[in-house]
Structures are given as structure tokens and as C-alpha cells.
Amino acid sequence: MSVRRLYVEKRQGFDIPAQKLFADLKELFAIEGIEQVRVIRRYDIEGLTDAEYAQTKPVVFYEPPVDVIYEEELPEIANARVFAVEALPGQFDQTADSAAQCVQLVTQKERPVIRSAKSNCFNW
């Protein structure tokens, strides 16, 4: 069982956090030149079999009608600056803990190791 990386992004129209961040940067901080902001959630998942991963992916990690997923790598994002924010070692990661609890409920097995981060992409 290897570590799987899953990126989840809200589809256009459902990307409220990205829209809010874009508005804040333009209006509150008066940052000029930003054309688009994308917020992408990253999950590193360890301890699941292929079947368990396939079973829990659309139930726990994303909503198929609302989200777009990328497995293992993000596609090329032209003219973008990307930075990721994640919990430091020892800090509680509520998103990862909630996902691990949900996976445990679905699979009825031991809780997997999950880490999460948020990637912010800014197009200039």
C-alpha cells in the first residue's frame, strides 16, 4: 500500500473560497493584475487497498457533481504562482482527521494515515 496523492478542486460556479479570496485580494489589499485564483485541496492517503481507495474516493474526498479531481499530479497551470499551506508536524489537521474518520466508517477497518494541504494558485 503506497501513498496516493489526490487533488480536489471545486468546479467553476461552486468555487466560493476561490472567489472570496480573489475578491479580498482585489478589494481589501488592492493587488492589481491578478486574473484568476484557484484553491485546490490536496490529500496524501496511506494505508488503503486499491478497492478501498476506489470505494472511498467519491464518498469521502470529493463530490462528483461539484468537484474536479486530479490524481498524483496537478496539470500544468500556465502563468500561475502556486503555494501550498499545510499543518506543521505536531499540529492538528482537522480536515485530514475528519477524512480519516470517514474512511474508517466506510471501510470498517483501521483508520488510514491522511494528510491534507491547500494549494492556492494565482494567475497574473
Which residues fall in each region the model found?
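Non-catalytic terminal accessory/regulatory regions of metabolic enzymes
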Residues: 1-124
